[in-house]
Design a protein with these regions (language model features):
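Outer-membrane beta-barrel and related beta-rich outer-membrane complex signature
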Residues: 109-110
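Extracytoplasmic/periplasmic ligand-capture domains
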Residues: 1-100, 104-105, 114-151, 155-251
Length: 251
């Protein structure tokens, strides 16, 4: 191979359309399951083949516990807030829309729970029940309330509370991000989304510029234990989901 020409396409639907039209020689990263039916239906016409490979990875969302915004940082480190944001997510809807009902909603356990006998059912299912009323009560307990009557919740200091999720489709399907952003907005945490390149996402994450971290994670316990980057802040290499960038500076 003398030359590889790679073009970034900023919208997943446009990327899929180009693959259907046979304009792509090879594509692996950033091709997510929701595109599967369209790609399979048009494989003969587009003169390409589709290989669906199994994976142990799962879409992981985390709040930046060392975000530069100190008011948000205090909220993100409140366990009531984090539980609320988890209970607000409609995982069954995500499973049906993004995974065609083939997935199993689970809590993230840092490694593939099926490779570790000590991971309990309670840990696998911690805070994953879709309960927006319960989520609102937890937000109240975290003092994240609507203080000005506009219908949106504010930070405890009275400042406007807005979240922006920057994501790359290499790490998560756009449909998953869209559903979660709407779920969070429904409980009063107005959330917007922006698709960026993988390089842009990684640079912003490592510069501690993101409120929410989003990536695909999953590896066997043996691999996890052999990778020291997973055990100390920021808990991943540059190419993974990182959290606690300021903790890394402290250490």
């Amino acid at each position: 191979i003398n030359e590889i020409n790679e073009v970034y396409i900023g919208h997943e639907d446009v990327q899929t359309a180009k693959m259907v039209a046979g304009e792509v020689s090879y594509k692996a990263q950033s091709v997510n399951l929701p595109s599967g039916p369209v790609l399979l239906q048009n494989a003969e016409k587009g003169n390409y083949s589709v290989k669906l490979r199994p994976t142990i990875g799962m879409s992981v969302f985390s709040l930046n516990l060392t975000t530069q915004d100190e008011a948000k940082r205090a909220v993100f480190n409140d366990l009531n807030f984090r539980k609320a944001m988890s209970h607000a997510i409609n995982r069954d809807q995500i499973n049906e829309i993004a995974y065609f009902g083939l997935g199993t909603p689970l809590q993230y356990t840092a490694f593939d729970a099926d490779t570790a006998a000590f991971v309990t059912s309670d840990q696998r299912n911690a805070n994953i029940k879709f309960d927006q009323d319960g989520a609102k009560k937890l937000l109240d307990a975290a003092n994240v309330k609507d203080q000005d009557g506009d219908g949106d919740r504010d930070l405890p200091n009275g400042q406007e509370f807005r979240l922006n999720i920057q994501f790359a489709t290499q790490g998560v399907a756009a449909q998953v991000v869209e559903i979660i952003a709407q779920n969070w907005s429904d409980i009063g945490i107005t959330t917007s989304i922006k698709e960026v390149t993988s390089d842009e996402y990684r640079a912003s994450q490592s510069a501690n510029e993101l409120d929410v971290h989003v990536w695909n994670k999953g590896e066997p316990l043996a691999v996890f234990l052999g990778d020291t980057a997973e055990l100390v802040p920021p808990f991943a290499s540059y190419f993974g989901l990182r959290n606690g960038m300021l903790w890394e500076q402290y250490i």
